[in-house]
Curated annotation (Swiss-Prot):
GO BP: alkaloid metabolic process; methylation
Keywords for this protein: Alkaloid metabolism, Magnesium, Metal-binding, Methyltransferase, S-adenosyl-L-methionine, Transferase
Single GO MF annotation: caffeine synthase activity
The protein, known as: Probable caffeine synthase 2
Family to which this protein belongs: Belongs to the methyltransferase superfamily. Type-7 methyltransferase family.
Species, as recorded: Camellia sinensis (Tea plant)
Top-rank taxon, per record: Eukaryota
């Protein structure tokens, strides 16, 4: 089995279950939060960043959907607006698109709109380059980044939480793949501890790369509840665990594979995020809020259409990490079972999806 950093990516290509074809919700979240990104660019210009010849920005965990193009276009448009207002010199925008090496960079760059890049723009020339690697470590030289953006990436962990096996070698989260109502407290504690460790590494790395007064706009999956096992946080993973368990009962998957697998992801609360940032001490929190949105599949009246769409979207971002543990050959059967479970057990209501948006400024000194 591959390590997390080798297996964690969204479904590749442009097929029916690809991330490129199933990232509309992420795009919606990005569009909703664009005013925050626009304000961040405004703030940078108020701090005399327009005196620079080039502004360096990065989209961390960019994946391969159209979301990152919206980010680039927004930054470029705001820079052009501020250049006109301030009558400043022609600026250059350098954008780095980062994700783990397994990301589908080919599809990403094939889809890059020509109007976004090039050097013939009247006010802002834009250059885009891919940067494969883990954002939990250093990616860029010291004091080289002015603006950092990330959408739906920071909640992914570097590994499954440590300490989920007893001294006797027994699985402590047996039959589950994430935190659930039946998980013992040690599972919840292990997940929070792993997120604390990884998010701290993320902040430490960015604190060296971001210039003083530079800005980060981070959007991640999270929760409004203090309970990490609330259905809004664990819905997809809970249903996938049920589907996997059914295949175990049919002898198609080894039970040990289910009992020893824990998803490397954690949806934190606002309080947990705030505590980690404040403990780190490298950034000030300029803005932080949580908001809920209905899953787009809830707009469908037919329960089978709703279930199939939800399963297809879920497959786009869960299949690579799930197939790494359970095998590619079982995936079609697994997600077919998953669809049936969504329809039969949860046809009334798919929980709202909670996001956290966080704006951080690098402390001077």
């Amino acid at each position: 089995m591959k390590e997390v950093k080798e297996a964690l990516f969204m479904n590749k290509g442009e097929g029916e279950s690809s991330y490129a074809q199933n990232s509309s919700f992420t795009q919606t979240v990005t569009s909703m939060t664009m005013p925050v990104l626009e304000n961040a660019v405004e703030t940078l210009f108020s701090k005399d960043f327009h005196l620079l010849q080039a502004l360096n920005a990065v989209d961390l965990g960019c994946a391969a959907g159209p979301t990152t193009f919206t980010v680039i276009s927004t930054i470029k448009r705001m820079m052009e607006k501020k250049c006109r207002e301030l009558n400043c010199q022609t600026l250059e925008l350098q954008v780095y698109l980062n994700d783990l090496p397994g990301n589908d960079f080919n599809t990403l760059f094939k889809g890059l709109p020509s109007k976004v890049v090039g050097n013939k723009c009247e006010e802002v020339s834009c250059y885009v380059v891919g940067v494969p690697g883990s954002f939990h470590g250093r990616l860029f030289p010291r004091n080289s980044l002015h603006l950092v953006h990330s959408c739906y990436s920071v909640h992914w962990l570097t590994q499954a939480p440590k300490g989920l096996t007893s001294k006797e070698g027994l699985a402590l989260n047996k039959g589950k793949i994430y935190i659930s109502k039946t998980s013992p407290p040690v599972v919840r504690e292990a997940y929070l501890s792993q997120f604390h460790e990884d998010f701290t590494m993320f902040l430490n790395s960015r604190s060296q790369e971001v210039v003083p007064n530079g800005c980060m706009v981070l959007i991640l999956r999270g929760r409004l509840s203090s309970d990490p096992s609330d259905m809004g946080s664990c819905f997809t993973w809970e249903l996938l665990a049920v589907a996997i368990a059914e295949l175990v009962s049919q002898g198609l998957i080894d039970e040990d594979k289910l009992d020893t697998f824990n998803v490397p992801s954690y949806f934190p609360s606002l309080e947990e995020v705030k505590d980690i940032v404040e403990r780190n001490g490298s950034f000030t929190i300029d803005h932080m809020e949580g908001f809920e949105l209905d899953s787009p599949e809830m707009q469908e009246n037919d329960k089978w259409v709703r279930g199939e769409k939800f399963a297809t979207v879920a497959r786009a971002f869960t299949e690579p990490i799930i197939s790494n543990q359970f095998g590619h050959e079982i995936m079609d059967k697994l997600y077919e079972k998953f669809t049936h479970i969504v329809v039969s057990d949860f046809e009334a209501k798919i929980p709202k999806i909670t996001s956290i948006i966080l704006v951080l400024s690098k402390i001077v000194g």
